[in-house]
Amino acid sequence: MDPKLETEEAIGRASVVIDCTPSGVGHQNKERYYHKFDDKVKGFMAQGSEDGFGVKYARGINDSVLKNGDNQFIQVVSCNTHNISCITNTLALDGHGPENLKEGRFVCVRRANDTSQAGGFIPAPAVGGHSDEMFGSHHAKDASELFATLGYELNLFSSAMKVNSQYMHVLWFALKTKEPTNLNEVKDRLAANDLVAMTTKNMTSTVYSFGRDHGHFGRILNQTVVEI
């Protein structure tokens, strides 16, 4: 496909710009192009790798940051941050408020690379480090900053590792809440959230395959998939 417009011409004609470029390029584009058009374009969005691009956002969690046009630059958080935030919001915060969560602990078991990537695969599981003394890996830190847009200060901590697979990520979590709950209530809360998918499949490959066959353009657009 040959481009019909030069970069600045295309940006100037847009109402909203969604930046899907590789890691780091979004920040470069912001400085090189986007600031030139911030009086014409309603909003600029970048993906999870572009930390600091703009206010963090995840659908259904902090939709208020999109209202009134107060935040022109938006960072849609990563898939793992969506996963952590969706689980935390659905099971601990929704209907109770931030004071209900005593602590949240997470382990992100990440895929080695994407099926579309030729490089970066690893032959064996690899343990990730903790880059932040308070939050552990950046995943909990990002989730904390997402909830901070609502004025919440949550006790979250995450660790991460990669496994030699190309199919999706897996999240282990433990939430301590002030209000008592039970298994049936947890299942009901998950089922009531349209952004949560429930499945009886317990392998990432079979979940991935089902999404490829039946998802929107072969994609799973839910924020998390829970095996029951």
Name each model-derived stretch.
Residues 1-115:
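N-terminal Rossmann-like NAD(P) cofactor-binding subdomain of oxidoreductases
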Residues 1, 100-228:
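C-terminal substrate-binding/catalytic lobe of Rossmann-fold NAD(P)-dependent oxidoreductases
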